[in-house]
Each structure stands twice: as structure tokens, then as C-alpha cells.
Design a protein with these regions (language model features):
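Regulatory N- and C-terminal appendages and interdomain linkers associated
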Residues: 70-171
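Single conserved hydrophobic/aromatic residue that forms the stacking wall/gate
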Residues: 1-7, 11
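Catalytic activation segment of kinase domains across protein kinase-like and atypical kinase folds
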Residues: 32-33, 37-82, 92-96
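Conserved alphaE helix
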Residues: 14-15
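Protein kinase catalytic-loop region centered on the HRD/HxD motif
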Residues: 25, 30
């Protein structure tokens, strides 16, 4: 039982949490990978295959940078969900070594994968709040989401917006 032992913690922390943290970092920087298929993801949580990647200029939540991604599968706003999907694909490949009983292996893998959403949200909230010079909270999340809406409405450059905000000095 790989997932009922200490290896479960390794998988959770070292694969799921690193993937969540990596994609939260991308989102916080306005980075669009472009080709997040499973063979372009590393279990160590590092970015590879910089083919059609880009830093977002004018903010558009559904921005795509791969010329073949007509459906928007790897769009900016899809990256967190694709990260989770890729982890599910990895878990599916590992089912035979998780538990000999397939149903039990699926149950154990699902238990691990349920932590992805909260892990991503935590790191993303911390990164977004930090970009505004705040601690992560419901209020900082609301403020950041409102800022993204303004950025999208006016097609503001992702990086330049935060540089400009940083230059504001309050007495």
C-alpha cells in the first residue's frame, strides 16, 4: 500500500503540493505555459518545455499562446485545473502500485488528490496578496480579483500594472 504509508505524505507534499505551488507561481506572474500536456510536467514541480509560453501583456483571463490550442484547453485560467488533471493522470498510472485492489487504489489516490485545490488556493492567495503588499485573507482575495477585472476590462499589462502599483507611495 504505497498511499497508506509514509510514501503518501511524500507524494502529497512533493508532487501535489509542488505542482500546486508551481502553477500558483505561474498565475501570480501572468505566465502562460501553453502546452501543459502530461509529458511537459515534472513531479519535482519545475517548468519544462518553454515552446509556446509567454508572459501575459494585456490581461485576458482566457489568453492562449499555443497556435494549436484553438479550444483554450491550456488558457491562463485553465492552468490550475489542468495541473490537477495531470496529477490525476499520474495517479492513474500509479494505481497498480498504490494497491492491488483497483477500487481501493482509486479511493486512496482520490484522497491524496483532494488536497490539490486547497493547496493551490492557499499558495495563490498568498502570492496575490503579497503582490498587493498584504497578508492573505478573504479581503485581499476580493481586492485582487477586482483588480484582475479592471486589468481585463482595460487590457492592462500584467507585469506593468504591479510595477506601477509598487511605485505608489502613501504618506
Amino acid at each position: 500500500h504505497l498511499f497508506s504509508s509514509a510514501a503518501s505524505d511524500v507524494y502529497k507534499r512533493q508532487v501535489m503540493q509542488r505542482t500546486a505551488a508551481l502553477i500558483a507561481a505561474w498565475q501570480g506572474l501572468g505566465f502562460i505555459h501553453g502546452v501543459m500536456n502530461t509529458d511537459n510536467m515534472l513531479i519535482c514541480g519545475e517548468t519544462i518545455d518553454y515552446g509556446p509560453c509567454a508572459m501575459m501583456d494585456g490581461f485576458r483571463i482566457n489568453q492562449v499562446f499555443s497556435s494549436i490550442d484553438h479550444a483554450g484547453r491550456y488558457a491562463y485560467h485553465q492552468q490550475p485545473a489542468i495541473g490537477q488533471w495531470n496529477l490525476m493522470a499520474l495517479s492513474d498510472a500509479l494505481l497498480p502500485i498504490i494497491d492491488p485492489d483497483r477500487e481501493e487504489a482509486i479511493r486512496l489516490a482520490k484522497g491524496v488528490l483532494e488536497g490539490y485545490g486547497p493547496a493551490f488556493k492557499l499558495v495563490y492567495a498568498e502570492r496575490c496578496a503579497a503582490k498587493l503588499g498584504l497578508e492573505a485573507s478573504d479581503e485581499s482575495d476580493t481586492l485582487f480579483q477586482s483588480l484582475l477585472e479592471v486589468m481585463q476590462k482595460h487590457q492592462l499589462d500584467f507585469t506593468d500594472t504591479f510595477i506601477e502599483l509598487e511605485s505608489i507611495r502613501f504618506n
